[in-house]
A protein has these predicted regions:
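N-terminal accessory segments that target, anchor, or regulate ATP-driven/P-loop NTPase machines
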Residues: 1-52, 113
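Conserved ASCE/P-loop NTPase catalytic core
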Residues: 33-640
Length: 640
């Protein structure tokens, strides 16, 4: 299929289909979606959720307290927003059931760059997927059911066509009322069309924004007289009116009001009757115009607070259904957001060194969290991400304790994802010769940006503390392990020798026997054996050597029976592997011959160095990054 035929097919599927009123009513009998409300159609577009039993995943079970959670595939790209999306879907579900929510404005409240606009755009795109039925030619896309009177016609429509009476709450528009007079009351002359909502053509989807307080009026919402038609029609004639307002265009669909509370209050008045009564007045002496759609608004907290604190706005506030859209507070989900943004940019295939996105996500999340009492904020961040800190930080509290003490506004302040992505852009372009990102450049760019942003002194100090107290030290540890792991593979034989010698000495020490070295003939008594064992144990801080030695020897004896009497590899027992690594890297000088980029003393050293670079590249670094990060690590270790 060519692109042209593909486009043509897509266009054909959304073309109008025309019916007589009788055919439409017969269709209602067979298909409930023919008279579905906007909320019902949006629920259809969202689809059924996937139920996730968090008890089967230790991380999720800690985050969601072992509950079964709902995840909607339609919102798969919105990471870490399960609670917010659940509330939005609940609003549509209740509105679809005809409850109070159908008379309320869905209001997304959150900080800048938190995802409000993205959610609004997603809802508008979802709305485009499900068609609706309207009277042909109606400038406000009104439902054919608006032609009927619930009190007079409701019983007949329910008995003959199965249409519940609650769907007959709409009124006829002034345009339809004029046509009815022209048809002499013969409603069968009305034609019905099947339409797909369209953002592009403003069919059942509209967007309005606040304008200048001095010149914006309600015509942006309700339309106005078309001056060009006044030659043909009187000013109060339905055909002289331009139904161009957002409420007119969004009937039976969704109207988005961007930064709603920045608009003058007089502009918002039509929304009161549109939500509560399902209709609103025009700017002229016409009859009321129907509105059976969804009102979606969003703005930042500052506008909401000033609006709420004004007593004159109480009637309006009562008609608002608030859904908070805070910043993401889980590091793993914040990383997914960055990955999504990178995928949609030309940096999708650029090199990003391991831990770069994680470090930026940690910094962003730390800026959004409230500092806990009697516990550090870094531990709180890890608990929020579902980590178990029982063994590593005994002062860490449970996730629920942290949430309770933080209050309901956590996540409504801090650095936005937008800010973080701008930082990431600078990091990728930091090196003039290579489009790539790494944590060392990230630390530098973050520090520079914090100085330039002119944050309040307290906030600035707090952000710098995050870098120096939490992120930099942990990255030194991380890159150290990366380098050591790549280095270690050059010295696997050395590691095995230490392992074998440790097991041998520990075995003789436990049995309280002297050990004679078969090569040198040197005899080691129990005290000498203990000294040799401690040389390996002390760098790792082993607090109970006796138990540790017994544990290791028992493990090796069991392993030998399954390995033809040979010792297992030194990597096979985690506890001893860590001890040996600490022993091997207790002196930075041991690393220098392999990881430094100075001239090598021998071909053997050069080969090991080349092997080290190859292994680092395999781990996700560019050759240039290997050099930069290795030299940075050696400098830092030396200064410590």
């Amino acid at each position: 299929m060519t692109i042209f035929s593909h486009f043509q097919n897509r266009y054909e599927t959304t073309r109008q289909e025309e019916y007589s009123l009788q055919e439409y009513l017969d269709l209602c009998k067979q298909d409930r979606s023919a008279y579905a409300t906007a909320a019902e159609r949006l629920l259809m577009a969202i689809g059924e959720p996937e139920l996730v039993d968090t008890t089967s995943n230790s991380r999720l079970s800690r985050i969601f307290s072992n509950k079964v959670i709902r995840r909607y595939p339609a919102f798969a790209e919105f990471h870490g927003m399960e609670e917010c999306i659940d509330q939005i879907v609940a609003y549509f579900r209740h509105a679809a059931q005809g409850l109070e929510e159908k008379k309320q404005i869905l209001y997304l409240l959150g900080p800048v760059g938190g995802g409000k606009s993205s959610l609004a755009e997603k809802l508008k795109h979802l709305m485009e997927n499900v068609p609706f039925y309207a009277i042909k030619g109606s400038p406000v896309f009104e439902s054919p059911l608006g032609l009927f009177n619930a009190a007079e016609d409701g019983t007949i429509l329910e008995e003959d066509f199965g249409i519940p009476q609650r769907y007959l709450s709409s009124i006829m528009s002034p345009w339809a009322a004029k046509r009815l007079i022209e048809f002499g009351g013969d409603i069968s002359q009305f034609r019905v069309v099947k339409l797909y909502p369209s953002i592009l053509n403003q069919i059942a989807i509209a967007k309005t924004e606040p304008g200048d307080e001095n010149n914006q009026d309600i015509s942006a919402l309700v339309g106005k007289v078309d001056i060009r038609k006044l030659e043909e029609y009187p000013q109060n004639d339905a055909d002289a009116y331009s139904y161009s307002g957002a409420l007119c265009r969004a009937n039976q669909g969704l109207m988005e009001f961007v930064e709603m509370f920045k608009a003058p209050i007089k502009v918002l008045h039509p929304l009161l009757t549109a939500t509560q009564e399902g209709n609103y007045n025009s700017t002229e002496g016409l009859g009321s115009i129907p509105f059976m759609g969804i009102l979606l608004a969003h703005s930042n907290e500052s506008e909401w607070h000033s609006f709420r604190n004004n007593k004159n706005n109480e009637a309006f506030i009562d008609r608002i259904y608030i859904v908070k859209v805070p910043y993401c507070l889980r590091v793993s989900d914040e990383i997914k957001i960055y990955e999504k943004l990178l995928t949609n940019s030309s940096l999708a295939n650029a090199h990003c060194a391991p831990d770069t996105l994680k470090m930026l996500a940690q910094f962003s999340v730390l800026s959004r969290l409230k500092e806990p009492e009697n516990s550090n904020v870094y531990s709180k961040m890890r608990v929020y991400d579902g980590e178990n800190l029982k063994d590593t930080d005994p002062k860490a509290k449970s996730l629920q304790e942290y949430r309770d003490s933080a209050g309901v506004d956590e996540g409504m302040n801090g650095l936005s994802t937008r800010f973080a992505f701008k930082i990431l852009s600078k990091v990728f372009n930091f090196d003039p010769h290579e489009i790539a990102a790494n944590p060392v450049h990230l630390l530098y760019v973050l520090e520079q940006q914090i100085e330039q942003e002119q944050f309040p002194a307290e906030v600035r100090e707090r952000y710098l503390r995050f870098l120096k107290e939490y992120l930099a030290p942990r990255y030194i540890e991380f890159i150290g392990k990366e380098i050591q792991t790549a280095y270690l593979e050059s010295y696997s034989e050395y590691g095995q020798n230490i392992f074998d010698r440790y097991v041998l000495y520990a075995d003789f020490w436990i049995q309280d026997q002297e050990y004679r070295d078969p090569e040198t003939g040197e005899i080691l008594n129990r005290m000498a054996l203990n000294e040799e064992l401690e040389k390996i144990e002390k760098p790792a801080g082993i607090s109970n050597p006796k138990d540790f030695r017994n544990e290791i020897v028992n493990f090796v004896l069991r392993a030998r029976s399954n390995n033809n009497g040979k010792n297992p590899t030194w990597l096979s027992y985690e506890k001893l592997r860590v001890v040996i690594e600490k022993k091997m890297f207790s002196n930075t000088e041991d690393l220098l011959p392999v990881i430094s980029f100075n001239a090598k003393a021998s071909k053997e050293d050069q080969q090991k160095h080349n092997d080290f670079i190859t292994r680092m590249v395999e781990r996700g670094y560019t050759e240039k990054q290997v050099r930069l990060l290795s030299e940075w690590y050696l400098r830092v270790r030396k200064s410590q």
